């Protein structure tokens, strides 16, 4: 059996595996003791019986065990497997420095589990939430979340609060699908309750890991609520208990592919869409702002307040002074997110790649991660642990003055092309290399804008040169 959501719960020393089937939500737990972390050293290397660990101001020793499982490195040298007790993955950072050469000691533990234990990841219909926050900028309620908007397969809705809603209920009379609260805290309590009741598999946002998620965690904490409630396992990176709930610097420094809310998949749609766009050779987008992308892809624009056309003024004053536009603006944002995703199959493409690789979701964004998963699964040898190279400075090239040195100077009517990746195919397709240049035009079967546009050619004077 395979699993779609693969989560390492270091606080519990367990893997959590979550999926859905015809009976609803399913999950399974695997204790680290039943699948302990490991790496390799060269056979014949010193075998230390114990190692000293320093953690949270304390020192203690852990027991190290060694096994021969027939593994070799790329050069055919025999390797010895290293494991330890307690079986905590984070101890690997201390252990691997005991030897000059180690192998696969830099593999994330959930990658390791997927490679060793999973044979497939079955397809199922995920519950997806497209979400966005608005928060107050300036004034008495500076920094407070004012509105949380959602779009799901069942429609869209928004949570909002107003300090004067009891006295001015008419401010939301003309806005559909809105639930109103008297305080930010009440709104957040309801949002967390609905999140846990509906239990979405995937939370999809635009730059969410950089802005929205840290803000949500910060405001939950500021309102005396435990941000760990965002996770079905009450485990959120950067949120910990030390006499009280505290936040570490990790909360404001999530990278766009990591999964800080354990048990849910977080997708930054901006990153996935940008990679999809670039990989299809459409050229580099000048802006990744949601309004720009929505206009390019959907021909749609975000709402603009007639009362406060300046964005900064709108975000500072729109909440209380142009409420209807403010709430509709928030709802429209998540509608645009879902449409961009649906019309480009962006999240489904990422999930398909995950099923193809049989890997955790966060391994499916960069070639280095995908390559490591593939080679660990297919290779008959173990790769050396990666080492950070030494940074060295070097002298730049000398540029000669063509007038005094008699070298070649300016050439007129010369064009320079710079395409990202796939150079051979593009040189031939665009007929721009002197080695393969052709003067024989060839008709296109489809519009040259492919893969963006598969329509028939109508009135465009494109030339394509036969180079084969």
Give the residues covered by each predicted segment:
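Conserved RNase H-like, two-metal-ion catalytic cores of nucleic-acid enzymes
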Residues: 1-54, 106-108, 112-202, 393, ...
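Residues immediately flanking
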Residues: 131-133, 269, 417-419
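Conserved catalytic core of nucleic-acid polymerases
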Residues: 98, 419, 433, 443-468
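Charged, flexible boundary elements
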Residues: 86-121, 373-405
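Non-catalytic nucleic-acid-binding interfaces of large nucleic-acid enzymes and RNP effectors
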Residues: 1-108, 222-261, 299-316, 324-335, ...
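Common nucleic-acid-contacting/processivity interface regions adjacent to the catalytic cores
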Residues: 311-441
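Active-site-proximal helix-loop-helix substrate-binding element of RNase H-like nuclease domains
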Residues: 158-159, 167-171, 175-178, 182, ...
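Short secondary-structure boundary/capping segments
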Residues: 145-147, 214-226, 234, 281-282, ...
């Amino acid at each position: 059996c395979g699993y779609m959501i693969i989560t390492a719960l270091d606080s519990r020393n367990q893997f959590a595996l979550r999926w859905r089937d015809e009976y609803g939500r399913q999950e399974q737990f695997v204790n680290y003791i039943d699948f302990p972390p490991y790496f390799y050293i060269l056979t014949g290397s010193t075998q230390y019986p114990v190692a000293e660990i320093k953690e949270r101001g304390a020192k203690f020793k852990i027991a190290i065990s060694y096994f021969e499982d027939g593994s070799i490195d790329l050069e055919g040298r025999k390797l010895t497997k290293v494991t330890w007790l307690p079986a905590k993955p984070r101890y690997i950072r201390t252990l691997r420095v005991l030897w000059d050469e180690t192998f696969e000691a830099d593999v994330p533990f959930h990658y390791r589990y997927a490679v060793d234990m999973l044979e497939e990841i079955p397809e199922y219909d995920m519950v997806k939430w497209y979400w966005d926050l608005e928060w107050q900028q300036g004034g008495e309620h500076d920094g407070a979340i004012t509105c949380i908007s959602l779009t799901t397969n069942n429609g869209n809705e928004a949570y909002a609060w107003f300090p004067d809603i009891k006295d001015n209920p008419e401010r939301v009379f003309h806005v559909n699908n809105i639930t109103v609260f008297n305080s930010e805290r009440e709104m957040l309590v309801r949002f967390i309750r609905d999140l846990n009741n509906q239990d979405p598999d995937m939370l999809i946002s635009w730059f969410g890991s950089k802005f929205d998620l840290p803000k949500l965690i910060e405001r939950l904490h500021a309102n005396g609520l435990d941000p760990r409630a965002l996770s079905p396992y009450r485990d959120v990176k950067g949120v910990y208990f030390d006499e009280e709930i505290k936040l570490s610097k990790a909360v404001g420094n999530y990278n766009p592919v990591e999964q800080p809310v354990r048990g849910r998949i977080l997708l930054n749609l901006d990153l996935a869409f940008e990679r999809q766009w670039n990989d299809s050779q459409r050229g580099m987008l000048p802006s990744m702002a949601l309004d720009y992308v929505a206009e390019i892809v959907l021909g749609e624009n975000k709402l603009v307040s007639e009362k406060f056309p300046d964005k900064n003024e709108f975000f500072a004053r729109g909440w209380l002074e142009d409420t209807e536009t403010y709430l509709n603006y928030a709802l429209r944002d998540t509608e645009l997110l879902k449409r961009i995703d649906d019309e480009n199959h962006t999240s489904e493409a990422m999930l398909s790649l995950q099923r193809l690789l049989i890997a955790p979701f966060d391994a499916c964004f960069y070639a280095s991660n995908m390559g490591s998963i593939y080679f660990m699964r297919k290779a008959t040898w173990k790769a050396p642990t990666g080492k950070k190279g030494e940074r060295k400075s070097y002298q730049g090239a000398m540029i000669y003055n063509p007038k005094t040195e008699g070298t070649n100077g300016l050439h007129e009517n010369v064009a320079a092309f710079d395409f990202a990746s796939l150079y051979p195919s593009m040189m031939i397709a665009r007929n721009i290399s002197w080695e393969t240049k052709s003067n024989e035009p060839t008709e296109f079967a489809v519009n040259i804008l492919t893969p963006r546009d598969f329509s028939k050619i109508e009135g465009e004077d494109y030339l394509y040169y036969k180079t084969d």
